[in-house]
């Protein structure tokens, strides 16, 4: 089983790019998006266990230079078009 979380990140305005690059290097972070709105970055976190979130988010992302604030959304269920395509293609490869 794995745990997925979406981390909304506010950064110091002049450190967004550097923070994004540093966050992508943290184990457990699979993707980082630069976004418009209240938050500057969105990180997708995928870890093996719930306890691992503490290592990645407050122990990693929140400590990155330029990160001012984070808000974490823990996923109950993951829906992905890519996962569904893989599921339904089993046995139909040519």
What are these regions (language model features)?
Residues 1-94:
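A compositional/biophysical signature of low hydrophobicity enriched in polar/charged and small residues
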């Amino acid at each position: 089983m794995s745990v997925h979380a979406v981390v909304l990140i506010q950064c110091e305005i002049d450190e967004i790019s550097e923070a994004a690059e540093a966050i992508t290097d943290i184990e457990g972070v699979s993707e980082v998006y630069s976004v418009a709105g209240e938050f500057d970055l969105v990180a997708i976190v995928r870890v093996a266990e719930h306890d691992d979130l503490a290592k990645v988010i407050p122990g990693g992302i929140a400590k990155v230079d330029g990160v001012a604030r984070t808000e974490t959304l823990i996923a109950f269920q993951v829906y992905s078009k890519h996962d569904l395509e893989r599921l339904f293609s089993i046995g139909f490869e040519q």
